[in-house]
Amino acid sequence: MEGTRLGFEIVGDISNIETVAVGSSIREIARLRRQYGPGRWRKLKGIAMVRLPDATLCRAEVHWYESHGMGMCEIKVKRLLEE
């Protein structure tokens, strides 16, 4: 999975996945529905290894939106984690 246009790439799987919000609890729900279409939108977070633009590998907390049939959208690195 790549997020290179965002300046990072996810390497491997995302672990410790948790749901942050669902449906109308998502602050950006109107924009998501307008931009990507209707669906059961969820905001999730998890831990992943990411490759930064300088080729450094590190663990990071990542957040993203997901809808059935749509997959992952707008993946963001929220913070880098200490090893």
Features from the language model and the residues they span:
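Cysteine-centric segments in proteins
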Residues: 1-83
